């Protein structure tokens, strides 16, 4: 190769390559954020919270979840990576990274919206599994709401 000539191929400008890689990475991240939908629902359609006081996870809520939710949302590979077999995991949520329960605010807790069938394609339990796992009643949802509003303890 003669001195002063650029090698064949890319052209020798590494900074152009770095800038292009940076731009492509930024575009990929923007696309990923766009795909993550913000889930919204009309809280006015929720069943009213129960008047019952002193609700606890172990005594009042866990039995409801065991009947309708825990079979799919427990174990090594829970659906949507959301475990519902302990208080901490019920609150934490799953693969979305968002909390499923917001202690003190049942109307903004996604889990309540899902069991209330207010989010399309997120009805829980799924309608095609209701022969094995019954949907929660309005009264049961009201208990869950009251428990959350009381701090989800």
Regions found by a protein language model. Name each.
Residues 14-15, 80:
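Beta-strand-connecting loop/turn residues
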